Amino acid sequence: MKLSTSLEMPFRESTDPICSVCNFSSLIAPHFGGLVCSACASFFRRTVALNIHYLCKKDNQCKGMRKNCRACRFESCVKIAGMKRSLVKERKNLNNIPLYILNRRNETGNQGVVRAFVSSNQNRLENRLSLSPLTELPINDEMDVSKILKTTPSSLLKYYVEQVSHGKQFYMNTLNIRTKEELFEIVSYQSKVAAETCRTCPGVDLLDNRDILILRKYFQFSNIWIESTWKYWFSNDFSNDTEKFDIKLMEFIGQVKSTLLISLSRLKFNIFEFTAFKAICIWKLVYHETSRAMKIVAQEHYEGVTKALISYYQTYTLLDSMEIAIRVGEITLLVSSVFQMYHDMAKLYLHMGLPF
């Protein structure tokens, strides 16, 4: 099944009219004085209601502005579609306003929030790991403590973020290796890292030794292949040495690059999104192989991480409820490709004589 890997809806032939703002074929209707699609109407309403002012690095001359340049998109809402700011009602419920907007209002009154364009330098690893301090994860969930995991959703996501941002790293990315000896070295190293991670993972104290050994296997897999693929995406360390390589290993790495790597490059996860994706992969894989106790713990992790991610979107991004639902759906859907990757990895390990 072909997976959609962006926030855009997949292309389809349609007789629907074209939205004058985004130029996409869609159902259009009157919104705030203009005829536009529901997505552009939602974008306009949110921008005006929160008093946000976008900046464009091309002086509002961007082409194909949908989702790419919000400044040009908003300008098109006003100048092309004729939408009127005066028809948007002010938000009175403060619970529906992102925290950074409220903080900005407290500092400057209601002068508006300026959102600049994103620098291309932010595609590098060090900038992705500092998109938002760990302390900025949603923390207003003290009453939402999991009785099973004994932690809140935000603390759970923070636990996984710290594993990615501050965890022990091997000196070589898995997607750059060429021989089974190098893979053996990585597997040996990550086996120890996975054992350490499992000792501190919420809910592990409820599992028996067999379940813990299985969980370690999936933590190891996620470190070696999932996290390495994400970091490979924005790394400049690409190896082109093909003089000495293992054919089966190279075939599998090629498969990872043509599936997971392409999906990650299109979705452009920040560290919170990737961390949630990685955690969901681990516990979805675990869910189908273990005891009832493990299934309960796995479900708690899945629900906790998902809830924390949604809270992060609502608090620190400009995504509306529909965009958040689409984004979470994209992340969850991508997990299905990891299932096949895991099974193919198991075959590779058996072929190479690696412990599995």
From Swiss-Prot:
Main location (coarse class): nucleus
NR C4-type Zn finger ranges: 19-40, 56-72
InterPro entries per UniProt: NHR-like_dom_sf (IPR035500), Nucl_hrmn_rcpt_lig-bd (IPR000536), Znf_hrmn_rcpt (IPR001628), Znf_NHR/GATA (IPR013088)
Pfam families: Hormone_recep, zf-C4
Residue ranges of the TM segments: none
Cellular localisation: Nucleus
Highest taxon above the source species: Eukaryota
Entry-linked SUPFAM superfamilies: Glucocorticoid receptor-like (DNA-binding domain) (SSF57716), Nuclear receptor ligand-binding domain (SSF48508)
DNA-binding region per UniProt: 16-90
SMART domains the UniProt entry points to: HOLI, ZnF_C4
Coiled-coil ranges from the UniProt annotation: none
Domain NR LBD: 144-356
GO molecular function, one term: sequence-specific DNA binding
A GO CC term attached to the entry: nucleus
Keywords (A to Z) from UniProt: DNA-binding, Metal-binding, Nucleus, Receptor, Transcription, Transcription regulation, Zinc, Zinc-finger
Role summary: Orphan nuclear receptor.
Entries under PANTHER family matching the protein: NR LBD DOMAIN-CONTAINING PROTEIN-RELATED, NUCLEAR HORMONE RECEPTOR FAMILY-RELATED
Family indicated by similarity: Belongs to the nuclear hormone receptor family.
This protein's name: Nuclear hormone receptor family member nhr-169
